[in-house]
Amino acid sequence: MAAVELEWIPETLYNTAISAVVDNYIRSRRDIRSLPENIQFDVYYKLYQQGRLCQLGSEFCELEVFAKVLRALDKRHLLHHCFQALMDHGVKVASVLAYSFSRRCSYIAESDAAVKEKAIQVGFVLGGFLSDAGWYSDAEKVFLSCLQLCTLHDEMLHWFRAVECCVRLLHVRNGNCKYHLGEETFKLAQTYMDKLSKHGQQANRAALYGELCALLFAKSHYDEAYKWCVEAMKEITSGLPVKVVVDVLRQASKACVVKREFKKAEQLIKHAVYLARDHFGSKHPKYSDTLLDYGFYLLNVDNICQSVAIYQAALDIRQSVFGGKNIHVATAHEDLAYSSYVHQYSSGKFDNALFHAERAIGIITHILPEDHLLLASSKRVKALILEEIAIDCHNKETEQRLLQEAHDLHLSSLQLAKKAFGEFNVQTAKHYGNLGRLYQSMRKFKEAEEMHIKAIQIKEQLLGQEDYEVALSVGHLASLYNYDMNQYENAEKLYLRSIAIGKKLFGEGYSGLEYDYRGLIKLYNSTGNYEKVFEYHNVLSNWNRLRDRQYSVTDALEDVNSSPQSTEEVVQSFLMSQNVEGPSC
């Protein structure tokens, strides 16, 4: 008789045993807690797979149980799945654990140092997990409790612990946009480092300086951010955790991008991507972090198509790890929305960009307060997309509705930015510039002019006369003067200035030049200068040929499969370039 193919595959003996334990969960609940952490986790994961989230939630909300589960390090990816499912289900497990840990710390305030040290270690692991999972407020509560324990003993071990606490605290405050608290956290860390120095001890400063760089970058203090990234790079040594090295390389790359030091930025971020994938694997959240920053680099060097692909890869990883309504997923959606908007700007096909922008806003509004700063950038991106959809819309009523929605989003973003950063800030200036463009679309030309001039003035004072951001605003004001206010002489000067900056920073094939060239062709047609019309038609044709050749083959992910240099060589190359150039600020 011929062999018949099995219609089911038998479970392994181990999986059968796990299933049997789960089937008898109510009776064996207490016994489960005495199992080794890996086996205990597998039981809980089976509960998750069977959709028994209430029972799983009751287990994970107990600090002792969850602390033990956290020790199953090779299951972290799966733990994120379970945890996010509970949060999506409405089980506030992050808040419950943070509160339980905080209470425990208050109970043991009078206990001996060994008890406190054990609690601090638990806090670091718990807070680290909550931070990695994006639950920053709860992680902050945990790290503050750890810091409080550290201050109870004025001795060297606890000074080291306090420094580590401050670094972690600064990271979660940066992630949660609590920038006003960030600087005091850094100063506290420096106080403990000074104490250690006086006793002949040194704590590595790479992670601390890297987090300070992230804080300053978020506040658009780019010169200061760059300076501290250089200091962080000096602190990279062979014994540092790979995670710290990767994060410092990422921050340094971003600082180089905004300083328009693209060669340095490329070397740093490509090595960070390679290092993260090599050490953590291609499905790890840390790898997705590096991809987002790689996408940022590619977008800024005008390799927009590859930027979209990289952002999509980062989103795919974050969705596979976290899924659901998670802040890490939201930020990836937002980055992909903006790059898709830029990529499809000429075609006018904004469905994909709008989808990702709305997903980002939907997630953020679900898990964070409605006045959270993270909403400012997501709303800004959606507003930009709606404006372009409105411009292409043939129904006047729909056009007005979309423009008004975009206006409300831009105003909301501007208020959030001003509240966080004040008037004199690059982020605030960007929002003024966006409003200027919108007012032009709404045919409110004087208001548009006022907004553009305000944006240019702030950007010039903060970034200098020849920055990319300045060129953008100058080009937008030129467009207003050319298309709607008939101020051709002013428009011509501004177009030529915008073109000069774009060529200097990005070369002859820069994508943004198209709009300036087309603007000049229209301008010279309007003024009857047909010789110039012919000249710029030729310039535009040459530009199109350059664009066809640019970035036609390169696969950005293939480009980082290996690294031609070691980490030490990358760091030394960067630092040597600083010595050659001298101080940057």
Swiss-Prot record:
Function (record text): Substrate-recognition component of a Cul2-RING (CRL2) E3 ubiquitin-protein ligase complex of the DesCEND (destruction via C-end degrons) pathway, which recognizes a C-degron located at the extreme C terminus of target proteins, leading to their ubiquitination and degradation. The C-degron recognized by the DesCEND pathway is usually a motif of less than ten residues and can be present in full-length proteins, truncated proteins or proteolytically cleaved forms.
Family matches, as InterPro entries: APPBP2, TPR-like_helical_dom_sf, TPR_rpt
Notes on activation and inhibition: E3 ubiquitin-protein ligase activity of the CRL2(APPBP2) complex is inhibited by APP.
Lineage of producing organism: Eukaryota, Metazoa, Chordata, Craniata, Vertebrata
Pfam families registered for this protein in UniProt: TPR_10, TPR_12
Major location (coarse): nucleus
Pathway this chain belongs to: Protein modification; protein ubiquitination
Species of provenance: Rattus norvegicus (Rat)
GO biological process, any: protein ubiquitination
Name of the featured protein: Amyloid protein-binding protein 2
Cited SMART domains: TPR
Ranges of the TPR repeats in the UniProt entry: 50-83, 120-153, 206-239, 288-321, 333-367, 429-462, 471-505, 514-547
Subunit-structure text: Component of a CRL2 E3 ubiquitin-protein ligase complex, also named ECS (Elongin BC-CUL2/5-SOCS-box protein) complex, composed of CUL2, Elongin BC (ELOB and ELOC), RBX1 and substrate-specific adapter APPBP2. Interacts with APP; APP interaction inhibits the E3 ubiquitin-protein ligase activity of the CRL2(APPBP2) complex.
GO CC list: Cul2-RING ubiquitin ligase complex; cytoplasmic vesicle membrane; microtubule; nucleoplasm
UniProtKB keywords: Cytoplasm, Cytoskeleton, Membrane, Microtubule, Nucleus, Protein transport, Repeat, TPR repeat, Transport, Ubl conjugation pathway
Membrane topology of this protein: Peripheral membrane protein
Gene behind this protein: Appbp2
Post-translational modification summary for this protein: Rapidly degraded by the proteasome upon overexpression of a C-terminal fragment of APP.
Molecular-function GO term, any one: ubiquitin-like ligase-substrate adaptor activity
Compartment(s) of residence: Nucleus; Cytoplasm, Cytoskeleton; Membrane
